[in-house]
């Protein structure tokens, strides 16, 4: 039986740039890696509230950490006169428990939220928690993505759908979805819906077409030919 690989990890360094960019000495590498995991988990709690579709981390050698928050609601994160972003920065520093760390949060706007796999997955999960039909929730996400310009989209929900005793997986797929083609720009994300019948897993794949060498949308990565 064929094994499925994560489409994001499959393309990192080829047609996708890594979400984390920094260099470290061998002695401090482990602690910085743990800090990155804590940062990602910290903002996972605010994904739905602030519509955060992607988090990127950059570090320099002076212990300065820049966290880029890609969101469709930048005003919600910034708050009035930037008060909310300041509170988030303080809360993150307390969460990391490292006073020497200089954390700087930067907000970037997602122009097309309907093409972001993470936001689509969270939208489906929210509808499932609101007891909407899992079929209609997936179809709404598919229509939104295709209308926004996606070349293809695939969704899947897994769990006790509609409260039945036996868990199962159901999904839909429209358009092209070449998961084995590395130059295919595929965005993949998962989400979890906490319902009264238990947890329901949500997976979303969004295809934005092929990335050709020299294209401006090549995500700062390149392929080499032997």
UniProtKB/Swiss-Prot annotation:
This is Small ribosomal subunit protein uS3. One of its GO terms (cellular component) is cytosolic small ribosomal subunit. The keyword Cytoplasm does not apply. Part of the 30S ribosomal subunit. Forms a tight complex with proteins S10 and S14. SMART domains: KH. One of its GO terms (biological process) is translation. The lineage of its organism: Bacteria, Bacillati, Mycoplasmatota, Mycoplasmoidales, Metamycoplasmataceae. Disulfide bonds: none annotated. PROSITE patterns: KH_TYPE_2. CDD domains: KH-II_30S_S3 (cd02412). Pfam families: KH_2, Ribosomal_S3_C. Keywords: Ribonucleoprotein, Ribosomal protein, RNA-binding, rRNA-binding. The keyword Ribonucleoprotein applies. Belongs to the universal ribosomal protein uS3 family. Binds the lower part of the 30S subunit head. Binds mRNA in the 70S ribosome, positioning it for translation. GO terms for molecular function: mRNA binding; rRNA binding; structural constituent of ribosome. InterPro entries: KH_dom, KH_dom-like_a/b, KH_dom_type_2, KH_sf_prok-type, Ribosomal_S3_C_sf, Ribosomal_uS3_bac-typ, Ribosomal_uS3_C. Residues 39-109 form the KH type-2 domain.
């Amino acid at each position: 039986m064929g094994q499925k690989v994560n489409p994001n990890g499959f393309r990192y360094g080829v047609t996708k740039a890594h979400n984390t960019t920094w260099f470290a000495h061998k002695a401090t590498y482990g602690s910085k890696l743990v800090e990155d995991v804590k940062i990602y988990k910290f903002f996972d709690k605010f994904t739905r509230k602030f519509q955060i579709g992607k988090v990127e981390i950059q570090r320099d050698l002076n212990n300065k950490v820049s966290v880029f928050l890609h969101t469709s609601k930048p005003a919600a994160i910034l708050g009035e006169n930037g008060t909310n972003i300041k509170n988030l920065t303080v809360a993150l520093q307390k969460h990391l428990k490292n006073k020497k760390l200089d954390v700087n949060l930067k907000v970037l706007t997602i122009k097309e939220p309907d093409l972001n796999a993470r936001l689509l997955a969270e939208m489906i999960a929210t509808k499932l928690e609101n007891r909407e039909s899992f079929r209609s929730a997936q179809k709404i996400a598919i229509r939104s993505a295709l209308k926004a310009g996606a070349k293809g989209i695939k969704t899947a929900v897994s769990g006790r759908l509609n409260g039945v005793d036996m868990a199962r997986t159901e999904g839909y797929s429209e358009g092209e979805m070449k998961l084995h083609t590395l130059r295919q720009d595929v965005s993949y994300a998962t989400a979890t819906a906490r319902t009264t019948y238990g947890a329901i897993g949500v997976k979303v794949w969004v295809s934005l077409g092929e990335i050709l060498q020299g294209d401006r949308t090549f995500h700062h990565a390149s392929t080499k030919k032997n």
